[in-house]
Amino acid sequence: MIEISGLTKTLYGGGHKVEILKSIGLTIPSGQFIAITGHSGSGKTTLLSLIAGLDNPSQGTIKIDGQDITKLNEDELALLRGKRFGFIFQNFHLIPTLTALENVVLSAELNNTPGATKKSEDLLGIVGLGDRQHHYPAQLSGGEQQRLSLARAFVNEPNIILADEPTGNLDSKNSNRIIELIRELHRVKQATIILVTHEPQVAKQSQRILTLEDGKIIDDQINREL
């Protein structure tokens, strides 16, 4: 479970104070698929970065299964991210000199995940890249590269997946395919998924939709359509 209380992020510059997030309170049960929406500048990506421990809040707490990650040092946060988190970004961050399989295996080996090669091969099969595992990223389409990113994110069997605009650079066909795969992996792996998107049709594929505006939560609803 993720419990966020009084979370505030304030930036200072040029004699001005800008509150990016304003006393956010939020509880995300384990295994929930939640989408965070809002206009550009509403605080979506900042909230995701704080949950990942990639940035420090000005005030407030972020507890993951009761542990306040705002109290951890950088080494402790790095260990937590490696063991508990998977990341999916708009830009794929793949290593161009490694094959698809090697990209996934490397992520597993860096986190000492047992059976790295077998798990990587299985996940590449799930995302439809089983026959392309020996291709390099440059030989894959944009949609295929994002599917490779999905496999890499899930290979360490993380408890929490953080996805920042994972369909932002894709056409509608590939966007739909990625969201279908995220939903399928969510069903199979039972990870908590927090997905930031500005696309309403993408948000509607989640179990819960949270809307931010001007650094505050203005709407929080269970998706009854699913």
Which sequence ranges carry the predicted segments?
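H-loop (His-switch) and adjacent beta-strand-loop-beta switch element
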Residues: I209-Q221
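Short, low-complexity polar/charged micro-motifs in intrinsically disordered terminal tails
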Residues: S42, Q221-I222
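ABC ATPase nucleotide-binding domains
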Residues: R224-L226
